[in-house]
Amino acid sequence: MTAETLIASLQLSMPELILAVGAMALLMIGVFSGERATPTVTGLAVAVLIIAGLWLVLKTGEGEAYGGAFLSDPFAKFMKVLALIGSITVMVMTVGHARSAQIDRFEFPVLLVLATLGMLLMISANDLISLYLSLELQSLALYVVAAINRDSVRSTEAGLKYFVLGALSSGMMLYGMSLVYGFTGHTGFDEIAAALTAEGRSLGLVFGLVFILAGLAFKISAVPFHMWTPDVYEGAPTPVTAFFAAGPKVAAISILVRIVINAFEPVVADWQQIIVFISIASMLLGSFAAIGQRNIKRLMAYSSIGHMGYALVGLAAGSMAGVRGVILYMLIYMVMTLGTFACILAMRRREGEHVEGIDDLAGLSQTNPFMATVLTILMFSLAGIPPLAGFFAKYFVFVAAIEAQLYGLAIIGVLASVVGAYYYLRVIKVMWFEEPRGEFARTAGELRLVFGLSGLFVLGYVLIGGPLGTAAEAAARTFF
């Protein structure tokens, strides 16, 4: 690698370098900041993420870096912006709640920055080795974050479960990568696609593909690799759960799209069957398993499993319309989920106790009409009721599936959506038609800002959907 190519590579990966250097600097600042360490480091972490985002949007060009292992293209840029917005939002949500959520440690924002760095590298990965390294960087930070509340048995259990199952999924994925490398002789996505076109598929290669897809399905908590999700969502502190539900899902879906559309495009018939099965299983389990839930964080866990199933409908189509649908679905899903978790974080009694039961929302329309109204809008949107953003998200992926002649998949998706609407409507019924059980403490300004903006986005998507759709189409065109 010459000096010129190295400089060009560094310029393309500047947002990632900003996060890497920023994380190391924040660690040093945290050590020497004394009692004010957590708010100081959290504020600076938000600033680092914003600087990286601005550099990404305004300065970063397009092209390959580090010998083709890193790729900067419109798709990567769009998904990186989503991941950064998710991370910044979670940081803002935790500013006033670190102590009450018992995550009052300066390492927390540093670990979130490192996890975000892993996400950005993952989205730009164009090689199996760079994919694995970035995935592990993200995962190792998240294992610690899940168990960061050492005084809570639930949090420690969540971290341990996530670590054991995450290590297993990483091992499966690595084994799949070794099979793909063994049968093609390459680790780069473009070279793998070229080898598959020239030589055709073999049984060993299909096994490798299955193991890689299984590892990534774990990261997006798709069935049958979803077992960790309800326990980790319930056990981890609420800001951590909000983080899990946003950025990492965006990054994992992004690399899943890049692998199947780019590297394994010549064997579309093989991976399409796998994606269709995972999608149907996730939609059905997400819809039916959530019906009996009494804890709102567990409900959101099953909701996220179902939503990943809907997102995979677009990927199964394998077309430009399908990829565009996936991109828009992840954008809308992230906004709805972060808004909902801001409301969950605001579920705090006057005595300071955080509550998570759906029944604790009883009579919220009388005690906090603004929060009840926003949460109602978000629940309707998650259920896919028109004309809210959630309806358009599902519409785009179902239309792509119909255009790809996957009629059965689209029909099952619509039916699962109808079943799923029940448990969202149950939350609305509890808020508006039951007597209050007590008032929540005054909602913090940053939480009101987050769920207010997300409610506004969901309501106003019908007006701003055009430019977002154009941007998503430009990102999807990267592959076609």
Swiss-Prot record:
GO terms for biological process: ATP synthesis coupled electron transport. GO terms for cellular component: plasma membrane. It is found in: Cell inner membrane. It is a multi-pass membrane protein. Belongs to the complex I subunit 2 family. NDH-1 is composed of 14 different subunits. Subunits NuoA, H, J, K, L, M, N constitute the membrane sector of the complex. This is NADH-quinone oxidoreductase subunit N 1. The lineage of its organism: Bacteria, Pseudomonadati, Pseudomonadota, Alphaproteobacteria, Hyphomicrobiales. The gene is nuoN1.
